[in-house]
Each structure stands twice: as C-alpha cells, then as structure tokens.
Amino acid sequence: MSAPDILKDFKGSLTIEQDGSISSASGILQESFYNNKEFASTIISMLHDVNKITSSNNQEFKRMTVSFSEQTFIVTAIGTKIYVVVQ
C-alpha cells in the first residue's frame, strides 16, 4: 500500500525533519501549518517529554495521539522523521 493510499482517510498530513523543518504537508495541515516552525517545535517538544516518560518506564514509544473536540492529531516518529496526520 502506498503512502497516498494510507493517507486518503486523513484531513491532512505533515512530515517534520529532526531539525524542526517541515519537509512536506498536505490537506488542512498544509493550509494551516506549512512553514510554521512553532508548530513543528511544539510537536518535537511533546515527543521529548513523552520519550522521558516512556524511557523511565522501559516502554517503547510508538505513537502519540492528541484529541480535540473537532480533530485528532496522530504523531508517529520513525527514524529521523516525524509524521503528523489529522483526522
């Protein structure tokens, strides 16, 4: 299954590099957050906090979900890239 097939059910997607730059965006995330370093650094900061918690409990971090009344952000870190999708 290709990335476009996987992402078709989401309202938008974003790829953040390790340095905080946004390398790609689509859908509502492109409209709202593309080139927004503050959004990217907030996501990275949240991941650092989660990593501290999971490391202290010997748990492996896989995915973080942040839910609001109108939308849900799903954040996944794989290698040096951070993928964000919104439902």
UniProtKB/Swiss-Prot annotation:
Keywords: Lysosome. One of its GO terms (biological process) is regulation of cell size. It is found in: Lysosome. GO terms for cellular component: lysosome; Ragulator complex. Its main location: other. InterPro entries: LAMTOR4 (IPR034601). It comes from the Eukaryota. Belongs to the LAMTOR4 family. Part of the Ragulator complex. Regulator of the TOR pathway, a signaling cascade that promotes cell growth in response to growth factors, energy levels, and amino acids. As part of the Ragulator complex, may activate the TOR signaling cascade in response to amino acids. This is Ragulator complex protein LAMTOR4 homolog.
